[in-house]
From Swiss-Prot:
Belongs to the glycosyltransferase 77 family. InterPro entries: Nucl-diP-sugar_transferase, Nucleotide-diphossugar_trans, UDP-D-xylose:L-fucose_XylT. GO terms for molecular function: UDP-xylosyltransferase activity. This is UDP-D-xylose:L-fucose alpha-1,3-D-xylosyltransferase. Its cofactor is Mn(2+); Mg(2+). GO terms for biological process: rhamnogalacturonan II biosynthetic process. Residues 1-21 are annotated as: Disordered. Catalyzes the transfer of D-xylose from UDP-alpha-D-xylose onto L-fucose. Probably involved in the biosynthesis of rhamnogalacturonan II (RG-II) through xylosylation of the internal fucose moiety of the A-chain of RG-II, a structurally complex pectic polysaccharide of the primary cell wall. RG-II is essential for the cell wall integrity of rapidly growing tissues such as roots and pollen tube growth and elongation.
């Protein structure tokens, strides 16, 4: 990690300290002289620059967004500018280990969930592969302040004020960009694992990525499957639909995986959010359409249900959880809507790690 940090700073010199103006302060200032007046005006300008946002800064662009002092950043304007110019290619190169990147997409209201997920990832020794795709500037600055190089923002930034609910227009806008992000990483030549941050790792998932398939994914249906179930894409139901989750995906940089991401993006672009279909207004239906339309061209692999259970099974069938104890790898806190309800459920099941184990996260305690 130390070597990575050194490389990062060699490529992009950062400084969180204000520029020194000692040479100015040592110069004589004569009252009413032209030079003295200019220096007084310069000092006033610098003073205002420290305490007021400059035009075009995130603070001015989003005056109501930085409302939580707990996520305020101490980065200097220069450092913020450097992180705004940080590219996905730079970020992926920095975090990739053995050609693999682990990606999540986060807006600032979900920083506690990011931290909770990171604790679980760190326990499996895979945190250095993590790249946080920040959906707002608060997240970009906070993550890179605490953990330099591990967050990147791909413009445009989304509204950072709201924790989007499943089915809302904001949630649709948030998730609709996902296949493009993943495709860009594949085009750079990396394997990529995507996770939602309302997940917790209980074991190392990489040992379950058997073979060399193009794409790996999980079933979102809560109906119990046999332990030795097929790893093929499930057959569509009577409505012609499959219910694969877009929450946990692993992709290799193959033509098949790239084709799947392109088709997913096309399906998303062909649908628009509306109130009448708001409970389907997320990227998952489009992902399933893309899977079914490319199934004969892409090498697909359905991951084990017992290892990667949907929240509709794990949190609703205590008997099954007991029978399969020790076999669970990643638990997804879905089949529930609402930030507070998700947090309470994690707490009820002993999976909310932030309160007692924050120091195990690369971000530490978020303040």
């Amino acid at each position: 990690m130390a070597q990575k940090q050194q490389t990062l700073h060699q490529q992009r010199p950062f400084s969180s300290s204000p520029r020194s103006y000692s040479s100015i302060s040592n110069r004589p200032i004569f009252l009413l002289s032209r030079n003295g007046l200019l220096l007084v005006l310069l000092a006033l300008f610098l003073l205002l620059g420290v305490f007021l946002p400059w035009p075009g800064s995130p603070l001015l662009l989003f005056p109501n967004k930085v409302s939580s002092p707990s996520y305020a950043s101490s980065l200097s304007p220069h450092a913020k500018s450097e992180w705004r110019n940080y590219t996905l290619a730079q970020a992926a190169k920095f975090v990739a280990t053995n050609g693999t990147v682990i990606v999540c997409a986060v807006s600032s209201p979900f920083l506690p969930f990011l931290n909770n997920w990171l604790i679980s990832v760190s326990r499996q020794k895979h945190q250095e592969k993590v790249l946080v795709i920040a959906e707002d500037y608060i997240t970009l600055y906070k993550v890179n302040e605490k953990w330099p190089g591990h967050a990147v923002l791909i413009p445009p930034a989304l509204d950072s004020k709201t924790a989007y609910s499943f089915g809302s227009q904001g949630f649709f806008n948030f998730t609709a960009r996902r296949p493009q992000h993943l495709l860009q990483i594949l085009e750079l030549g990396y394997n990529v694992m995507y996770n939602d941050v309302d997940m917790v790792w209980l074991q190392d998932p990489f040992q379950y990525l058997e073979g060399s398939h193009d794409a790996y994914f999980t079933d979102d249906m809560p109906q119990i499957k046999p332990l030795n179930h097929s790893h093929d894409l499930p057959a569509p139901d009577q409505n012609g639909e499959t219910y694969i989750c877009s929450c946990m995906i692993y992709l290799r940089p193959t033509n098949g995986a790239k084709l799947l991401m392109k088709k997913w993006s096309e399906e998303l672009q062909s649908q628009a959010w509306s109130e009448s279909i708001r409970f389907k207004a997320n990227d998952q239906p489009a992902f399933n359409l893309a899977l079914n339309k490319t199934a004969h061209q892409v090498d697909l692999y359905l991951l084990s249900q017992v290892a990667f259970p949907t929240g509709g099974l794990y949190f609703n069938d205590a008997a099954w959880v007991k029978e399969t104890k020790g076999k669970h790898v990643i638990v997804h806190n879905n089949y529930i809507i609402g930030y507070d309800r998700k947090m309470r459920r994690f707490q009820d099941y002993g999976l909310w790690l932030v309160d007692d184990h924050a120091l195990e996260s690369p971000l530490g305690k978020l303040q």
